[in-house]
Amino acid sequence: RQRQMCIRDRDMAKYGYDVTVFEALHEIGGVLKYGIPEFRLPNKVVDVEIENLAQMGVKFIKDCIIGKTLSVEQLEEEDFKGIFVASGAGLPNFMNIPGENSINILSSNEYLTRVNLMDAASEDSDTPVPFGKCVAVIGGGNTAMDSVRTARRLGAERAMIIYRRSEEEMPARIEEVKHAKEEGVEFLTLHNPIEYIADEQGKVKQVVLQKMELGEPDASGRRSPVPIPGATETIDIDLAIVSVGVSPNPIVPSSIKGLELGRKGTIAVNDSMQ
């Protein structure tokens, strides 16, 4: 998505349009900067793309949240003729299970942003990030693989992917799974968290897993995970990273009166994307 945004900005500038990009964070690049680890996509590669856009005349305004810092109405008053919303799917989903509010349970978005964009792993950084020794990452997508591989690089002695389906149903790319295994990541497939247990300080210390089996295919075409009655397992952890999907960022849509949204919170558009 962010790559497509760079291409669109470049093409608009090539056709002579004045393009201004409003970025909520303190660095340009979106998920390419905060979501993808340096070991998979070096920042210098992204910086080259951004510099190319700047050389073509694209303006970048950082630390500006449309819908909060500025409204869409204000942009229209400043004579912007077209507004393209590319705020992404930055709202992390959680499982809403008991104990999920315990300390040291983070979304993959927050964890990767702290490490990638805010340099939380550096001793000189003021941004806190938990350095777990026994880390559970919940989910089976590419972001889950990025999170668990990052945890290994930050010193996790045991790093696990916990996924409710089998490995064959994992949405992560085959090469990402391969790299994770090569780096010592464990895969607990057909397991699903049902509860977190915290210690006296409120920090997560265990996760209770429901063992699953595969049933009939669901709407996605993958076989549905079905709980095995009475089959649970409790494992010790000191950090959980939840990577079970994201939803569209609601800030921009909620700030525009009369905007129609789809079932999943996406902006409804016509054939010309308006």
Listing of model-derived features with the role each one plays in the protein:
Residues 1, 54, 62, 74-120, ...:
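Glycine/serine-rich phosphate-binding loop and adjoining beta1-alpha1 elements at the start
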Residues 2-7:
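Short, small-residue-biased leader/transition segments that mark boundaries at the very start
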Residues 8-14, 121-156:
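Rossmann-like NAD(P)H-binding beta-loop-alpha module
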Residues 21, 25-56, 60, 148-195:
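Rossmann-like dinucleotide-binding cores of NAD(P)H-dependent redox enzymes
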Residues 62-78, 190-202, 213-215:
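A conserved short coil-to-beta-strand element within the FAD-binding core of flavoproteins
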Residues 63, 131-134, 190, 270:
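Phosphate-coordination loops involved in phosphoryl transfer and adenosine-cofactor binding
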Residues 80-88, 136-138, 238-245:
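Short hydrophobic core segments
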Residues 101-132, 217-274:
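FAD-site-proximal beta/loop scaffold in flavoenzymes
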